Amino acid sequence: MSYLISLLFGYFLGSVPFGLVLCYLAGYGDIRKSGSGNIGTTNVLRVTKRKDLTLLTLILDAGKAGFAALLATYLFGSASVGLVAGLGGVLGHNFPIWLNFKGGKGVASTLGMMLATYPVVGVLACLTWVVMALLFKYSSLSALTALSLAPFYAYAFGGAAAYPYVLAFAFLALLSMIRHRANIERLINGQETKINFKKKVK
């Protein structure tokens, strides 16, 4: 029962579309009608050009899955229950009940969940994203690389004892690939939008 409760709690918390809400409150309207149509951090930056809204969206999207995992771990005294809650948080972000199950791609939520459940893996995944972004300037490629390497990081540090994390992170990496289908196609065709680090934002 603790697993089901944690999964549902994580899902409903993850379903809160912070990027959409923040953009509405800031006067930008429905972010789903602009840019890539996504409700996540990258599209918030693309549409608003505001670092404050982008950073807040990143923190809240990462935090909701991470918080769900930490709270479930604390309440039930089980790391595996916390892992399930974190998974629920990512699923909620990707398939929010409030938006007809049409949500984001779950990168920030996944990284937040990893930081909460297996900190060393979360840190390495974040660093991987940064390095890839600096080298190739593709947000999607950076995310896919970071999340795909996470299961290997978990196994490298935990061995057989880390199998629950390896499986969970592998599932999230696969989910991310599915959510990034259009990005992968654009990468292959050389049409993916690059991150412009030189462009000034407010």
Model-derived features: where do they sit?
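Interfacial segments of multi-pass membrane proteins
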Residues: 45-49, 72-75, 88, 92, ...
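C-terminal ends of transmembrane helices
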Residues: 19-22, 92-102, 129-136, 181-185
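Multi-pass membrane catalytic core of lipid/isoprenoid biosynthesis enzymes
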Residues: 46-73
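N-terminal signal-anchor transmembrane alpha helix
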Residues: 1-27
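Cytosolic, membrane-interface loops and tails of multi-pass inner-membrane proteins
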Residues: 22-54, 185-202
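Helix-coil boundary and interhelical linker segments in multi-pass alpha-helical membrane proteins
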Residues: 1-9, 67-84, 115-122, 155-168
